[in-house]
From Swiss-Prot:
Entry keyword 4Fe-4S: no
GO cellular component, one term: cytosolic small ribosomal subunit
The protein, known as: Small ribosomal subunit protein eS28
HAMAP family cross-referenced by the UniProt entry: Ribosomal_eS28
Protein family: Belongs to the eukaryotic ribosomal protein eS28 family.
Record keywords, A-Z: Ribonucleoprotein, Ribosomal protein
Taxon lineage: Archaea, Methanobacteriati, Methanobacteriota, Methanomada group, Methanococci
GO MF annotations in UniProt: structural constituent of ribosome
Organism: Methanococcus aeolicus (strain ATCC BAA-1280 / DSM 17508 / OCM 812 / Nankai-3)
GO biological processes: maturation of SSU-rRNA; ribosomal small subunit assembly; translation
UniProt xrefs under Gene3D superfamilies: Nucleic acid-binding proteins
Length: 75
C-alpha cells in the first residue's frame, strides 16, 4: 500500500481540548477534536493521540467511527 493511498482517505480534525494523559508512562494524550471534513463534519470526538499535541493542532484521522473511552479517576 502506498503512502498516497493512506492520506487520500484521512479526514482532518482540529484539537479543541487536551483532557488528560494515559498509558503506563503517560505517553498517550486524550483529546477532544472537531471533525473538519467528510460525512461527520462538525462532530466532536474524544480520541487518544500518541506524541506531542496542543490545542489548535490539525490531526489526520483514518476513521471517525470509534471514540475513546473516558479516562478513569485515579485512586
Amino acid at each position: 500500500m502506498s503512502d498516497d493511498m493512506i492520506y487520500k482517505e484521512a479526514i482532518a480534525a482540529e484539537v479543541l481540548q487536551v483532557t488528560g494523559r494515559t498509558g503506563v508512562t503517560g505517553e498517550i494524550f486524550q483529546v477532544r477534536c472537531k471533525i473538519l471534513g467528510g460525512k461527520d463534519t462538525g462532530r466532536i470526538l474524544t480520541r487518544n493521540i500518541k506524541g506531542p499535541i496542543k490545542v489548535g493542532d490539525i490531526i489526520m484521522l483514518r476513521e471517525t467511527e470509534r471514540e475513546a473511552k473516558a479516562l478513569g479517576r485515579r485512586r
